[in-house]
Amino acid sequence: MEDLIQTDATINPGNSGGPLINTKGEVIGVNSIKIKEAEGIGFAIPINIIKPILESFSVNGNFEEAYLGLFAYDKEVIPYLDNSINFDSGIYIAQISVDGPSKTSGLKVGDIITKIDDISINKMSELRNYIYTKKVGDEVSLTILRNKKERVVKIKLGKKA
């Protein structure tokens, strides 16, 4: 359960969707999931993920999720999958969708994404959170390592189906 805030706020069927509020009275998330087996443990979607969705709904009446069309593993996961792969920072591209924008960009399985628009990336969740702030059709620049050489790849974000 990545990208979620763990909370002890009571979440029951029918009351999910309410705000998660910090001690300053600020909304920091939307309560959404309760684990049945663990009494008193719930999860909320962070407000930084919700905000672009709400803004899109208020302006356009809908939300189109921007899409890169790839899946990557965090550096910490790689040794469990293949201990011959070594890199200092970034995320390892493990899969490229056949119909996504990454397919035509020149990205390859095995590339290491180190930055998006000059912002360092070390977790897939960081990449996802950044993409949440973008719109379908926006162009992003990915800095990648391939064969220990740095390259910049520009990708126009697609619409997630």
What residue spans do the PLM features occupy?
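Short loop/turn motifs at secondary-structure junctions and domain boundaries
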Residues: 1-3, 9-13, 134-135
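Second-shell loop/turn segments in exported
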Residues: 6, 38-41, 116
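Residue-level recognition of oxygen-bearing side chains
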Residues: 6, 16, 26, 49, ...
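Catalytic nucleophile loop of clan PA
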Residues: 10-30
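C-terminal recognition in membrane/secretory proteostasis and scaffolding
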Residues: 22, 52-161
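Short hydrophobic beta/alpha edge segments that flank linear recognition/processing sites
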Residues: 27-34, 113-116
